[in-house]
Regions:
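Metallo-beta-lactamase
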Residues: 17-20, 49, 54, 59-132
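Active-site HxH/HxHxD metal-binding segment of metal-dependent hydrolases
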Residues: 1-45
């Protein structure tokens, strides 16, 4: 598991990871957790690497993982849907800044891979939804 420090703590706390509120409390107790932060690089295979972008807003621990032109955003950015910031540790200003960070890191060849819905070209995103909030 590669995650932020906030997420490491949340994995073992069923209230912080919100599973308690869904009626299925889950607390991860494994030890194979790697804490990553902005600009960390995760070596993969065949010289491929994943670069970390800290993208808080949906929650304090959100990260985006960049692999070449693919951006795995999880809940930090779901294309063309406003970012949910009303949950524990959500922050509207950070969400706006994170959306702008993702936008600036992408180009016309970039693909956004969100945690929900389908992949989409970054050029098909209405960035004003996030930037002008």
């Amino acid at each position: 598991i590669y995650c932020s420090e906030y997420t490491r703590v949340a994995l073992s706390d069923h209230k912080l990871n919100l599973s308690f509120y869904h009626g299925t409390p889950v607390s991860f107790m494994g030890e194979q957790i790697n804490i990553v932060k902005e600009n960390d690089i995760i070596p993969l295979f065949n010289q491929e690497k994943m670069v970390i972008l800290e993208t808080p807003g949906h929650n304090e621990g959100c990260l985006t993982f960049q692999l070449a032109n693919y951006f795995f955003t999880g809940d930090a950015l779901i294309p063309n849907i406003p970012i949910v910031t009303k949950l524990k540790s959500g922050n509207k200003q950070q969400a706006k800044e994170s959306a702008l960070k993702i936008k600036m890191a992408t180009d016309e060849n970039s693909i956004i891979c969100p945690g929900h819905l389908n992949m989409i070209k970054s050029t098909e995103i209405n960035w004003n939804i996030y930037i002008n909030e």
